[in-house]
Amino acid sequence: MSHPKPLHALAAAALAAAVALGPAHLAAAATPGQPAQGLPTSEQLAAALLTVDDVGPGFAQAPATASPSAGPSAMPSPVNGCDALSDLINMHTGVPGPETPRAEVELDGQGGNPMVTESLTAEDAGKLTADLDAAAAALKSCHTITFNAGTNDSVTFTVTPVTLGDRQDAPAVRLDGTLAGVQLNAFVGVERFGTVGMAFGFFQRDGASSQLASFQYRAAVAKVQRALGTTAGSTTPPTATAPVTRGTSV
């Protein structure tokens, strides 16, 4: 059996789940509206994302069209095995409209091992709270979940709550499974920065250490804090926001 193609597809499916749990994709089901004022812009969010310079040598940025959240074809088959998490992922895999400031990135190591995804979304504080609460509840409810990458291969992962980096209050889980004897491991976490939500995913094969995942998570958190002028876990809006447009008096 040739492993790289199905392994990469399964990795993409698993990390698509991480992005789909982010508030950008939960917001995709919301009623369309105008871009919110007083929130960071998509450009400001993009500047806060990890780059190849942040994660270390050997990584390359995946083309935007190959992003795990680029559309339904990027996640060709639903996940199953945990109703709350599966329903949340399968219901919210669409790309949100322009009224939702967002940015995301996929960084691949050699041969797609490891893979890192990060998405940032800005939205109203109350809506963000509801979206992150839903994602956290879904993560906590799972013990196993199965990913099918659209090939003949599927993997059932055990799901274990973990702490990523130094953020003990941030919801995160570890996923462990095997495919044809190859060990697969992933970490998925969500984080809040005032009115910005982050979804983080890390996938590796033939390895189970959490050290690199935590290192990349710390790097992601630190960069968002620096770029947006905010603190992880805070409900205070970032200092980096779009200018408020004032109407003309008549």
Region locations from a protein language model:
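Sec-exported extracytoplasmic/periplasmic mature domains
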Residues: 50, 60, 124-127, 137-140, ...
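N-terminal "mature-domain start" segment
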Residues: 29-102, 232-250
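Second-shell loop/turn segments in exported
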Residues: 39-41, 115-123, 203-210
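Long, compositionally biased interface segments
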Residues: 204-250
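A short, solvent-exposed beta-edge/loop patch
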Residues: 155-219, 223
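A small/polar (G/S/T-enriched), proline-flanked helix-loop surface module common
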Residues: 66-179, 239-240
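Secretory targeting and sorting signals
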Residues: 1-30
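Soluble non-cytosolic domains of exported or imported proteins
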Residues: 39, 49, 129, 207-214
